[in-house]
């Protein structure tokens, strides 16, 4: 499907988002009646019984004016070593409560217990005066017929979540000292799409990696917890760095400036997850090439333009430098006065701009829109700080990171290039749709073109902000 946007920043963004919203709504309507299959678990028998506070159990009609409590008797046979998939906690009254139910686990598949249920007995043994560890061990070691008495949580059950998040960091629960149970954690990598199953716990959500082939969920740090963790580490590192420096805090000057954002704001940006939705195939309008200086982006860009002039186009930059004899205004560059360029920068008409040898250079949103209006793909080779600006429904970019060769003879220059590339990758990898090791223009072109076509012809995960 080819989607077109109108002119101008605001109008283009709005119309493109509307088109993607319509596409998403159509997708939801077509798939709303497809139930998710869940692996079967041993059947559980439940029976509701009532008590008026005495030891006698019966029906609610025999309450004799006393407060009636409903107690549920849950019975099932446990014949394997599979964990039940629940965690317990003691509330303020020292009552044993179901704290968490793991999606895909035995209890979840049975539907026999719910978060907030109060457990009274396990196999006829009262849970009073037991620690959480003792109770968890009791559940783990039970075999054969299991009988649990609970006071059901009377709060309404919320419908299952339909939320998907793209991970913006790597996570290994075995290396996490904060997680309450390392074995229950979910390992994932940057770029993995995680279906969020439960987020009742403000610190630890439950999720599963989409496409992993398993129904079982694991614990993941919530966005709030992860952002707190990263901010704490960053603050600690900055404090240590300042205390070690005889000059205190140093200021860094950058010659590259970005419209609407600055490098200072970028440094304060803490990433965790990004909510995404799955859309049917649609055309990506912009191809963005990211990489360290000297990695070969220009060679790849020029080869794309030369091999596919009917498909790809590069937006001519604006500049305040004098026009040379062999240059055509509007083809090689747009030549403007310093006053005009300064005015347009103030009006946020540039997606990126900077200066070189006393002259200003920059790329306008308008020139990118003109390429889209010709039904062509705009190629941008920009600084990584600009990614958050171009990653919008308006531009619908496919972002490719170009990494240095891993086959060339080792040299000091190559070592520096790899160091610069790793610095970009570690900071901006959560934006990348594709990473390519540039072992040659021809090989890189083949990989890039195949991946771009695949992205435009198959369902895609996109930021939820592109749709709503």
From Swiss-Prot:
Subcellular location(s) of the protein: Membrane; Cell projection, Stereocilium
Function of the molecule: May play a role in the regulation of neutrophil polarization.
UniProt main location, coarse: membrane
Name of protein: 55 kDa erythrocyte membrane protein
Annotated ranges, domain PDZ: 73-154
GO biological processes: regulation of neutrophil chemotaxis
Entry keyword set: Cell projection, Lipoprotein, Membrane, Palmitate, SH3 domain, Transferase
Residue ranges occupied by any Guanylate kinase-like domain in the UniProt entry: 284-453
Membrane topology field: Peripheral membrane protein
Family named by the database record: Belongs to the MAGUK family.
Species: Gallus gallus
An example Gene Ontology CC term for this record: plasma membrane
CDD domains: GMPK, PDZ_MPP1-like, SH3_MPP1
Residue intervals of the SH3 domain: 160-230
GO MF: signaling receptor binding; transferase activity
Gene: MPP1
Domain of life: Eukaryota
């Amino acid at each position: 499907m080819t989607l077109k946007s109108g002119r101008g920043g605001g109008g283009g963004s709005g119309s493109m988002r509307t088109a993607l919203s319509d596409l998403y709504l159509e997708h939801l309507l077509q798939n709303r009646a497809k139930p998710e299959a869940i692996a079967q678990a041993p059947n559980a028998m439940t029976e509701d019984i009532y008590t008026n506070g005495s030891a006698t159990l019966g029906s609610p009609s025999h309450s004799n004016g006393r407060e009636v409590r409903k107690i549920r008797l849950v019975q099932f046979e446990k014949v394997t070593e599979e964990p039940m998939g629940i965690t317990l906690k003691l509330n303020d009254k020292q009552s044993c409560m179901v704290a968490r139910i793991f999606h895909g686990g035995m209890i979840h598949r049975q539907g026999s217990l719910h978060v907030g249920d109060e457990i009274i007995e396990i196999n006829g043994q009262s849970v009073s005066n037991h620690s959480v560890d003792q109770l968890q061990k009791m559940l783990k070691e039970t075999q054969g017929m299991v009988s649990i008495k609970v006071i059901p949580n009377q709060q309404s059950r919320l419908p299952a979540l339909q939320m998907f998040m793209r991970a913006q960091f790597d996570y290994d629960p075995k290396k996490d000292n904060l997680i309450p149970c390392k074995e229950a954690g979910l390992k994932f990598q940057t770029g993995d799409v995680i279906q969020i199953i439960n987020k009742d716990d403000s610190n630890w959500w439950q999720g599963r990696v989409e496409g992993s082939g398993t129904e079982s969920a694991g614990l993941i740090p919530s966005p709030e917890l992860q952002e707190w963790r990263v901010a704490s580490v960053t603050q600690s590192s900055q404090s240590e760095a300042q205390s070690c420096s005889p000059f205190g805090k140093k200021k860094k000057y950058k010659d590259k400036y970005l419209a609407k954002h600055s490098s200072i704001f970028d440094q304060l940006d803490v990433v965790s997850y990004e909510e995404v939705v799955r859309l049917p195939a649609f055309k990506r309008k912009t191809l963005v090439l990211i990489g360290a200086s000297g990695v070969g982006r220009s060679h790849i860009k020029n080869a794309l333009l030369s091999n596919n002039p009917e498909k790809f186009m590069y937006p001519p930059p604006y500049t305040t430098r004098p026009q040379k004899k062999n240059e055509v205004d509007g083809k090689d560059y747009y030549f403007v006065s310093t006053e005009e360029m300064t005015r347009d920068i103030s009006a946020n008409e540039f997606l990126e701009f900077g200066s070189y040898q006393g002259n200003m250079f920059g790329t306008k949103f308008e020139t990118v829109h003109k390429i889209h209006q010709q039904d062509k793909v705009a190629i941008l080779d920009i600084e990584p700080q600009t990614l958050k600006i171009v990653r919008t429904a308006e531009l619908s970019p496919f972002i490719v990171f170009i990494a240095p060769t891993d086959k060339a003879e080792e040299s000091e220059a190559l070592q520096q290039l790899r160091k610069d590339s790793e610095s970009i990758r570690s900071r901006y990898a959560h934006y990348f749709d594709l990473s390519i090791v540039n072992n040659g223009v021809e090989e890189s072109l083949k990989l890039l073109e195949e991946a771009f076509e695949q992205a435009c012809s198959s369902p895609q995960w996109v930021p939820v902000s592109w749709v709503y």
